Amino acid sequence: MIDIKLIRQDPDFVKDALKKRGEDTDIIDEILKIDSEWRSVTTELNELRAKRNDISKNVAKLKKEGKSSEANALIEEGKRIGEEIKSLEEKEKELQSKLRDLLLRVPNIPHESVPVGSDESQNVEVRRWGEPRKFDFAPLAHWDLGPAWGLMDFDRASKLSGSRFTVMYGKLARLERALINFMLDVHTREHGYTEVWVPHLVKRETITITGQLPKFEEELYLTEKDDLFLIPTAEVPLVALHSGEILEEKDLPKKYVAYTPCYRREAGSYGKDVRGMIRQHQFDKVELVWITTPERSFDDLEQLVRDAETILQRLGLPYRVVSLCTGDLGFASAKTYDIEVWLPSYNAYKEISSCSNVTDFQARRGNMRYRRRSDGKLTLVHTLNGSGIAVGRTLVAILENYQQPDGSVKVPEALVPYTGFEVIP
């Protein structure tokens, strides 16, 4: 949630930021209208409360002086003012609710370093690592390799749960688990993250903090009886861990890592990546979250990206890093880098990690602050998040990039201690 003060002071700046995102700016005028009404009602309320207090003092004084009739007249006026206050309090509450709902629907302001563009075609490549492999045979897609071994089963997954689910057996199931453990070990032992085990079901207010609600409810799985949401990413519980808390600057940054399954309805992706494991309703991911200070958050974002890149480098998978343009930024993000791994089946780079600085957008929603060492002032933290990395897509990248002419796949050297085998099947 962006600061209402910014909208009041410089609405044109906010509108320009929304235009760069390709968003409608009418909501800013609506916010200013409701905000003006709310402030007017608040001013009137304060005046009436002050008047009621004066009446109470005067009633006591008049009673002391034995002026009962005058005191009774003031009491009646006080009752009338009390009714006005009650009515205005209800109106104030209603306007506050409307204002918050509107503010929750405004995306974050893109950072000045973000390239301006309308869609992903205008994202800017930052760097590449590794070279896509040149095959001297016709490589197979993962959706052909896995089923041919009898280790990847889309048909039975569909029988169990419908489309966009996968069942894996034997060595592929073990490879998935090996990747999770490998990623967690690198991030905790080498990068200094604290591993966290989090709930996979969260409250409505929790998932509002990270920005999925209220705008994207149709993309989430909801257990209606309990009004709990299945998490679309571990970012949700990790960021909200410190909601409503005051942290000390000496304890920042906090760096958390968590493995969870993630659940997404993919409501807006009909017809995209329909084959294989690239776009699933349920997938495994290792998530990285930083809680840091405004002064260092953009430097921390660069480190977060490097931490995610390390995984791909250790696995020997070619990738590139791109800076998302304004029109492709996520709702809560001020700046995002995508890491895209090379997939031979697409003859293209495909997203495997998205790393974002959300600035104080989530902190304002969740009232997450820290006490500055210099002056003791309470300030909103900045939050960062990134995939460290998507497990299923990493498995896919290994199968496709490490396949051999005989239809087998070599396991990357870094994973052999985790798998206990060097070749699949």
UniProtKB/Swiss-Prot annotation:
<feature type="binding site">
    <location>
        <begin position="264"/>
        <end position="266"/>
    </location>
    <ligand>
        <name>ATP</name>
    </ligand>
</feature>
<dbReference type="InterPro" id="IPR002317">
    <property type="entry name" value="Ser-tRNA-ligase_type_1"/>
</dbReference>
<keyword id="KW-0030">Aminoacyl-tRNA synthetase</keyword>
<comment type="subunit">
    <text>Homodimer. The tRNA molecule binds across the dimer.</text>
</comment>
<dbReference type="InterPro" id="IPR002314">
    <property type="entry name" value="aa-tRNA-synt_IIb"/>
</dbReference>
<dbReference type="InterPro" id="IPR033729">
    <property type="entry name" value="SerRS_core"/>
</dbReference>
<comment type="similarity">
    <text>Belongs to the class-II aminoacyl-tRNA synthetase family. Type-1 seryl-tRNA synthetase subfamily.</text>
</comment>
<feature type="binding site">
    <location>
        <begin position="233"/>
        <end position="235"/>
    </location>
    <ligand>
        <name>L-serine</name>
    </ligand>
</feature>
<comment type="pathway">
    <text>Aminoacyl-tRNA biosynthesis; selenocysteinyl-tRNA(Sec) biosynthesis; L-seryl-tRNA(Sec) from L-serine and tRNA(Sec): step 1/1.</text>
</comment>
<keyword id="KW-0436">Ligase</keyword>
<dbReference type="GO" id="GO:0005524">
    <property type="term" value="F:ATP binding"/>
</dbReference>
<keyword id="KW-0067">ATP-binding</keyword>
<feature type="binding site">
    <location>
        <position position="387"/>
    </location>
    <ligand>
        <name>L-serine</name>
    </ligand>
</feature>
<dbReference type="InterPro" id="IPR042103">
    <property type="entry name" value="SerRS_1_N_sf"/>
</dbReference>
<dbReference type="Pfam" id="PF02403">
    <property type="entry name" value="Seryl_tRNA_N"/>
</dbReference>
<dbReference type="InterPro" id="IPR045864">
    <property type="entry name" value="aa-tRNA-synth_II/BPL/LPL"/>
</dbReference>
<dbReference type="GO" id="GO:0005737">
    <property type="term" value="C:cytoplasm"/>
</dbReference>
<dbReference type="InterPro" id="IPR010978">
    <property type="entry name" value="tRNA-bd_arm"/>
</dbReference>
<protein>
    <recommendedName>
        <fullName>Serine--tRNA ligase</fullName>
        <ecNumber>6.1.1.11</ecNumber>
    </recommendedName>
</protein>
<keyword id="KW-0547">Nucleotide-binding</keyword>
<feature type="binding site">
    <location>
        <begin position="351"/>
        <end position="354"/>
    </location>
    <ligand>
        <name>ATP</name>
    </ligand>
</feature>
<dbReference type="InterPro" id="IPR006195">
    <property type="entry name" value="aa-tRNA-synth_II"/>
</dbReference>
<dbReference type="GO" id="GO:0004828">
    <property type="term" value="F:serine-tRNA ligase activity"/>
</dbReference>
<dbReference type="InterPro" id="IPR015866">
    <property type="entry name" value="Ser-tRNA-synth_1_N"/>
</dbReference>
<dbReference type="GO" id="GO:0016260">
    <property type="term" value="P:selenocysteine biosynthetic process"/>
</dbReference>
<dbReference type="GO" id="GO:0006434">
    <property type="term" value="P:seryl-tRNA aminoacylation"/>
</dbReference>
<feature type="binding site">
    <location>
        <position position="287"/>
    </location>
    <ligand>
        <name>L-serine</name>
    </ligand>
</feature>
<keyword id="KW-0963">Cytoplasm</keyword>
<dbReference type="Pfam" id="PF00587">
    <property type="entry name" value="tRNA-synt_2b"/>
</dbReference>
<comment type="function">
    <text>Catalyzes the attachment of serine to tRNA(Ser). Is also able to aminoacylate tRNA(Sec) with serine, to form the misacylated tRNA L-seryl-tRNA(Sec), which will be further converted into selenocysteinyl-tRNA(Sec).</text>
</comment>
<keyword id="KW-0648">Protein biosynthesis</keyword>
